[in-house]
UniProtKB/Swiss-Prot annotation:
Keywords: Cytoplasm, Magnesium, Metal-binding, Nucleotidyltransferase, RNA-binding, Transferase. Residues 646-718 form the S1 motif domain. The lineage of its organism: Bacteria, Bacillati, Actinomycetota, Actinomycetes, Frankiales. This is Polyribonucleotide nucleotidyltransferase. Belongs to the polyribonucleotide nucleotidyltransferase family. It catalyses: RNA(n+1) + phosphate = RNA(n) + a ribonucleoside 5'-diphosphate. Its cofactor is Mg(2+). InterPro entries: ExoRNase_PH_dom1 (IPR001247), ExoRNase_PH_dom2_sf (IPR036345), GPSI/PNP (IPR014069), KH_dom (IPR004087), KH_dom_type_1 (IPR004088), KH_dom_type_1_sf (IPR036612), NA-bd_OB-fold (IPR012340), PNPase (IPR012162). Its EC number is 2.7.7.8. The keyword DNA-binding does not apply. It is an enzyme of class 2 (transferase). Gene3D superfamilies: GHMP Kinase, N-terminal domain, K Homology domain, type 1, Nucleic acid-binding proteins. Residues 399-419 are annotated as: Disordered.
Amino acid sequence: MDDSTQAAEAVITTPTGARTVRFETGRLARQAAGAVVAHLGDTMVLSATTVSRSPKEQLDFFPLTVDVEERMYAAGRIPGSFFRREGRPSEDAILTCRLIDRPLRPSFAKGLRNEIQVVATVLALDPDTLYDVVAINAASASTMLAGLPFSGPIGATRVGYVDGDWIAFPTHSELERATFDMVVAGRVLEDGSDVAIMMVEAEATPGTVALVAGGAPAPTEEVVAAGLEAAKPAIRELCRAQSELAAGAAKPQREFPLFIDYHDDVLETLTAAVGEELAAALRIAGKAERETELERVRALAVEKVSGQFEGRDKEISPAYRALTKKLVRSRIVTDGVRIDGRSTTEIRELSAEVDYIPRVHGSALFERGETQILGVTTLAMLRMEQTVDTLNPDRTKRYMHNYNFPPYSTGETGRVGSPKRREIGHGALAERALLPVLPSREEFPYAIRQVSEALSSNGSTSMGSVCASTLSLLNAGVPLKAPVAGIAMGLIREGDAFVTLTDILGAEDAYGDMDFKVAGTQEFVTALQLDTKLDGIPASVLAGALQQARAARLTILEVMAEAIGGPDEMSAHAPRVISVKIPVDKIGEVIGPKGKMINQIQADSGAEITVEDDGTIYIGAADGPAAETARSAINAIANPQMPEVGERYLGTIVKITNFGAFVSLTPGKDGLLHVSKLKQLAGGKRVEKVEDVLSVGQKLQVEITEIDARGKISLAPGAESIDTVSAGS
């Protein structure tokens, strides 16, 4: 080790053995404000935190940027792109950026306007280890060393629910036996008494339903709440190690200017001028009417107070927002009444409709208040599944969920084009919520693309996407193991009091302290996501929110069941995909030399055929008869019924020799019509040249006369062929 290197270790005890996360600094990236290399086994992530010299005074937000660089050399691979180098970040990298950003952002001092960038680079990857939680810890540690106004450290761990135990930092192989997988980030309270939860990203696994059916405990709300508690010791140990490293290696904290959005005198003046009118406007239930009145009150506020604060006009808008936030929160905490008049546990009006769009394979429209989501399902052959070139060991995705959030969904103008990080994150959350209930490849051999169109937004379009997608998938005929619904929960904290809100509005998301999204079936949770603006939330509060969310989820599932109770018949416009299993040693026969046989079957049937290494063959066609024709041809080659003497076939002559003609009876099964048998086709005369009687490609009715010990088949012309040829002559 270099003399300048300092290190600290966090040792986390699990039921399957200890996990050691090692933090090192001083050897790499020395010009960064803070740089840390985090190790977990052979996985190695470098995080570098840098800060701009001067603030961006014109900004009204904190300019934090988080980037994750996946280096393919980390897994001993060359990128699969045309230029053979890394390009735009993968979806996994983008999702990891969000995992890092979410707990880091609220930990910086309010009012900071210096640009801060955190870059996490994956240098080495153990194929059985997930790097995302290592990157979160590395990012927190490097930021701790950078001399910034940062209230870290933040510890993050993944916990998997395996065989009834919560295991910290589970491996890929352990997660295959897990019923729930959860990433939890948090911080230790100043008095050291507890760990406050700051971020959660969790989901049931694709194998959850099968594992539960086999006797494994289901990930119910109680189990998930226990998982949050199980994550705390690991978070505490990771924070301890980061603090130990920072104690010896951190730069002294620099003085950074903090830009206050407004001063108290502006807020007090606004309260006196328009406080009562603003409170009345906030009691209007309808969003459109409420926002119209709020705009009027806002204009009135500017008119009344702008002359009193010359040169400080920029303070009026944030002060008005602060007053709005205060009134909204006060009414909820004091009266238990929300902006639109609902109680804290009430859900907005629900609507669900399927088969909304013609010709598509499946569609649904789901509405919750003013939030409106259109779900559309497309089915295709398995060869259309997505190929993924990332550090993730899964190289393909059969289920692809895309989420679109056009600007008109909020009544605004804006850029339309490639998805932003938020859209990718929302799509991934909805995808994870549905993965546990999707049928297996064997049960439903289709590639599935689900698109969620957020047509109107006023609170939790991501959870609306889960509901719309469930409806759309069922409408497309996908045999889901159970329907899934989702709900977004909010939180208001005033002092030591916490008020949990069911089905939050967009404004409640903006003015509240937490966005907690929970999706699941009637029986268990399939996905959840927590973001908070606080320094942390007690796990007991989250446990209560989980139970409140369950009651709402069951209500939504009832409404969805009224729209569609189970999988519909597949659309006439959807492809038909069937499968057939053949012996592995027959794969070559089905494909044929240079693909001759499989190409012939595809040409004859019009079907598309995909052959798997295990002998499973998927056949896709525009209709059922075409698929069945291809399956019959494949079975004739690989799973043939042995022909018997006396059976008759309408065969095709495939080859002529001087001793007879070879006739194809079924694909891969030929018989010989000897020249001596041809005199029956020539009026009893001896045939000198086979070509005088028969030609390649000619259809001929034949009968099996003999099958020798080696399986060679001898044929004779059928009576129909004798009559046909005689009539022709």
